[in-house]
């Protein structure tokens, strides 16, 4: 049984709602935005809301209160509660002082340190508190002074890519003043990351032309990856054609490829909607068909996430609509998984292969059922079926869609799949039926009852001679359910 269970865990993608926690108001950001009083917090806590519980993303009350600028006295009260120790690990391995630094909350940072918060912690992405603050755009020199006092090192504290605080904060700078400050604390205009990228490349991500001009005046070199960095932009701010033309005017190479095999259009194609920008780069010889080290092209990225207008525009330049990335995913697969029905329909209209399979043997139907809960599902299904999609083909490891839906514990999906003539008793590579998988993984007997109602055989055994009843008996999620009907 244990062997089978491990196989299942390694082969199936489970929907997080399967293990969904009971709703906790302390995990709702709007609750903290209202700056609730301690009295209100106590009332909510008395009603069963857990003040120290981490949610599925490892955020808790203290983190959300910090992120939403709740009064510091309230946050201090939360910290006094059992389970909210100052060095508690939260999302991405960050303790509370990381989030205080992220919000430029120096008062809270000092309070946490007074309560023995550690300042030498490195998060799951390789960031110290200093570098996390810099990478999120913090420019308060008083906070940096304090972190230096707490033994942070401006010169040598680096992330996994070898970038120090000067490089990490560069994209967010409005002027040269913080650069001067960091230089006075030990940084250098010659500082580079592990790939030889310096402050000019990092500043190019932010697209501040005035700052870039100042750096040029200071004699800073314009690295070969500058246009790549500029094309990436920031999460909430993307660069414009003006920035790209400026960089070209000062000698930055436009048609460049980085160590990951990407050109500037790889990043731009995800969400830039300015046709003039695409025309500019294409006119400079930047290739929309270039596949990076993971096999993805700018066109694939557009099909994954951009508008129909951009996809149509770039499609005029592609050489093979059915090119695949290293995981065997075509532009059509990506559009089914992540884009809208109009892009799916367009790609099919220009020759995208309806029978495409990824490297694991999954067809388009696999990607379609993974968006079952979205409003796009039925529309995409209709388009794909009209173009010849067969829904009862086997997927990876000889799984049917019923196997996958059972592993996801998704009764609604199982019912929707019933019309596609899928053999409910088919066995996958591990010689398991959908019912056997459900018996091991479901949290409700309703799925078991449904599978039996559509013809699933219950008098079958695993390779370890275990019956359906045996499997369900070992399922902790069913320990309070009556499963005698499986005998």
Predicted regions: what they are:
Residues 137-266, 271-274:
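Solenoidal tandem-repeat scaffolds enriched in leucines and small polar residues
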Residues 45-50, 76-85, 110-118, 145-154, ...:
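Ankyrin repeat domain, specifically the short helix-to-loop turn at the C-terminus of the second helix
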Residues 34-35, 64-71, 99-105, 132-140, ...:
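Ankyrin repeat A-helix N-terminal signature
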């Amino acid at each position: 049984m244990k062997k089978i269970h491990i196989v299942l865990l390694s082969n199936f993608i489970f929907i997080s709602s399967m293990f969904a926690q009971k709703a906790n108001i302390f995990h709702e950001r709007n609750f903290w935005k209202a700056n609730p009083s301690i009295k209100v917090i106590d009332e909510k806590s008395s009603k069963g809301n857990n003040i120290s519980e981490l949610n599925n993303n490892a955020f808790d009350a203290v983190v959300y209160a910090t992120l939403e600028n709740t009064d510091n006295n309230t946050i201090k009260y939360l910290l006094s509660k059992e389970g909210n120790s100052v060095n508690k690990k939260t999302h991405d391995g960050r303790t509370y002082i990381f989030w205080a630094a992220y919000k430029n909350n120096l008062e809270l940072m000092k309070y946490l340190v007074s309560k023995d918060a550690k300042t030498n912690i490195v998060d799951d992405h390789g960031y110290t508190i200093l570098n996390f603050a810099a990478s999120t755009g913090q420019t308060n020199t008083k906070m940096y002074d304090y972190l230096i006092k707490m033994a942070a090192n401006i010169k040598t504290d680096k992330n996994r890519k070898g970038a120090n605080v000067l490089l990490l904060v560069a994209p967010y700078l409005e002027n040269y003043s913080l650069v001067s400050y960091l230089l006075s604390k030990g940084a250098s205009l010659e500082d580079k990351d592990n790939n030889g990228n310096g402050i000019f490349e990092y500043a190019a991500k932010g697209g501040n032309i005035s700052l870039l001009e100042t750096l040029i005046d200071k004699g800073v070199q314009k690295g070969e990856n500058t246009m790549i960095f500029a094309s990436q932009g920031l999460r909430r701010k993307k660069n414009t054609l003006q920035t790209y033309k400026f960089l070209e005017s000062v000698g930055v190479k436009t048609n460049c490829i980085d160590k990951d095999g990407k050109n500037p259009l790889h990043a731009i194609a995800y969400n830039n909607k300015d046709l003039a920008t695409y025309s500019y780069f294409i006119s400079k010889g930047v290739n929309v068909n270039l596949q990076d080290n993971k096999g993805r092209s700018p066109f694939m990225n557009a099909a994954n996430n951009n508008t129909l207008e951009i996809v149509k525009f770039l499609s005029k330049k592609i050489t093979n609509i059915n090119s695949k990335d290293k995981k065997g995913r075509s532009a059509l697969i990506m559009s089914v998984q992540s884009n809208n029905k109009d892009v799916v329909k367009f790609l099919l209209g220009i020759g995208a292969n309806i029978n495409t399979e990824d490297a694991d043997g999954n067809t388009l139907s696999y990607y379609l059922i993974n968006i079952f809960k979205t409003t796009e599902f039925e529309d995409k299904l209709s388009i794909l079926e009209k173009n010849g999609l067969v829904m009862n083909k086997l997927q990876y490891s000889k799984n049917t869609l019923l196997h996958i839906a059972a592993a996801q514990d998704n009764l609604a999906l199982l019912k929707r799949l019933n019309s596609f003539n899928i053999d409910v008793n088919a066995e996958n590579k591990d010689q398991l039926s959908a019912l056997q998988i459900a018996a091991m993984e479901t949290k409700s007997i309703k799925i078991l009852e449904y599978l039996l109602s559509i013809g699933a055989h219950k008098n079958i055994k695993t390779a370890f001679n275990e019956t359906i009843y045996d499997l369900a008996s070992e399922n902790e999620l069913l320990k309070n359910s009556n499963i005698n009907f499986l005998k």
